[in-house]
Amino acid sequence: MGNGMCSRKQKRIFQTLLLLTVVFGFLYGAMLYLELQTQLRKAEAVALKYQQHQDSLSAQLQVVYEHRSRLEKSLQKERLEHKKAKEDFLVYKLEAQETLNKGRQDSNSRYSALNVQHQMLKSQHEELRKQHSDLEEEHRKQGEDFSRTFNDHKQRYLQLQQEKEQELSKLKETVYNLREENRQLRKAHQDIHTQLQDVKTQVAEYKQLKDTLNRIPSFRNPDPVEQQNVTFPHGTHPPQGYNGREKLTGELQEVQPNHEAGPRRMEEKPLSSMQKDAGFQALEEQNQVEPREPEERQVEEEHRKALEEEEMEQVGQAEHLEEEHDPSPEEQDRDWRDQQGQNAAHLLDGHPQAEVEHSTKAATNFQSPYEEQLEQQRLAARRDEEAQRLREHQEALHQQRLHGQLLRQQQQQQFLAREMAQQKQVAHEDGQQQHQEQLRQQAHYNAVENDIAQGVEDQGIPEEEGGAYDRDNQRQDEAEGDPGNRQELREPGHQEGDPEVEADRAAVEDINPADDPNNQGEDEFEEAEQVREENLPEESEEQKQSEAKQGNVEMDEHLVMAGNPDQQEDNVDEQYQDEGEEEVQEDLTEEKKREMEHNVEETYGEHPDDKNNDGEEQGVHNRAHPKGRQEHYEEEEDEEDGAAVAEKSHRRAEM
């Protein structure tokens, strides 16, 4: 029983244990099943993912294969093109070598010709220099001879001028004295003529008085006592009927006291008595004066003309003032005629007492010899005084003329001294210009020789194939991307040049090369440069097309790589690196361009005045040396060739 009980208990324990194990197994199986289900789901998801990845990889591989096939085709095409280009380049190389050999031969022949011509020009220059020195010596000698002869002629001219001035002053003095004597003689003649007219009028008056007295019956038979007691008022003369001689002597005695004031009155107004006696003359001179009037008028006109000439020729104002105070004979004749008409009118009214008074006053015109002598002495003293005044005036005029002549001589000497100084200055400036011209020509010769030697050395260097190819590519790059760099390189070259050289070069460029006989082969080089400039745009277009093709290939590669994420990440990194490098290069190129533009602006901003000054110097040089253009033309050609060779060497150094 005990065993039965134990067995039952053990059986239950065993059953419970078994049940527990079954339950735990079931639970473990369920959990395992769930875990397996989750792993299965994960595996299915991974399988789907890998399936998708496999599909994408297959698609990418297909695209890669297609792109590879296209790349192989393009590579084959590029190989073919490269072969063709290589063949073309070989042909071009051969042709270029042939043309280079021809150019070398031409340049050598031209250099030999230019060397021969240079030697000829040197010999001509030496000959011209000798001729110039001889001409300068001759010019100096001729200048000395000219200055010597000029000084001799000048001294002789001044001496002759002084002699002629002295002779002229003497002649003027003699002419003036002769005219003064003529004027005085004419005055004396006029005085004598007026005295003669007065005497004639007195004779006519006496005749008239005689006739009137004869007509009066009371005076025909007068008593002797009455005849003795008859007196005439104002000293008038009795008629000739009574004791003619005694009465005439009495008349003369009565006339003499009134004669003292006569000469002074004759000096101041010689015709004053004629004015008073005009009444007595009016009746008689109606018959007598009329035939004399034409002669008197002629004499008066001649006298008036002579006086006008004398007045025009007289120098100084003192003589004019003195003559203005004295009445001229024309004025006296005019006054006499006016008063003659007035007195004739008075005579028509009748004035017997005036007739007697005028007759007595007319008698005062008779002068004694003593009074005439005194009058002549006074006239001589007056003439001496006038002659003294004339001499003093002539001496003053002579001194004034000598002073003016000395001033003129001083002015002429100063003018001649200024002219000589200007001539010396001009000769000095010409000598300096000639010396500068000689130095400049020597510098030109030296520069031309150096350029020619450098050109020969540069042409003698053999060029390699790769170097020629690199130079062509570099020339294309410069033609496409950097056109301003060449301009910048050329502009400093022009700026460093001498302005005189630029002026000569511009003067040479003004000459038409086609008209120049010395132009040997210049047109060939110009045509070659034009062909090269025309080929540069074509080469730049071809390079642009090749760059466009490369851009298209890069875009295709970018599209192909877009499908693969790993490759895409690698491509993104490479793209970032490439973009960074491109940005750095673009920044560098932009900075270079800015610096170039800034330099160009500075050159254009700094040197417009220099260019204008060069243009002005060029105009002055062209005006000053129009004949020197042909002489320097060949030298300028050599300089241009040397500049081209220097530019080529500079490009090689840059490459």
From Swiss-Prot:
Localisation per UniProt entry: Golgi apparatus, Golgi stack membrane; Endosome membrane; Membrane
Topological type in the membrane: Single-pass type II membrane protein; Lipid-anchor
Membrane side Lumenal: residue ranges: 34-655
Basic and acidic residues bias spans: 123-145, 261-270, 290-307, 319-328, 348-360, 381-398, 468-508, 590-620
Known tissue expression: Expressed by spermatozoa (at protein level).
Entry keyword annotation includes Phosphoprotein: yes
Modified sites of kind Phosphoserine: 328, 540
InterPro entries recorded: GOLIM4
Keywords: Coiled coil, Endosome, Glycoprotein, Golgi apparatus, Lipoprotein, Membrane, Myristate, Phosphoprotein, Signal-anchor, Transmembrane, Transmembrane helix, Transport
First-listed, main subcellular location of the protein, grouped into a coarse class: Golgi
Segments for region (Disordered): 122-145, 256-275, 285-655
Biased composition (Low complexity): 399-423, 433-442
Name recorded for this polypeptide: Golgi integral membrane protein 4
Organism of provenance: Mus musculus (Mouse)
Originating gene: Golim4
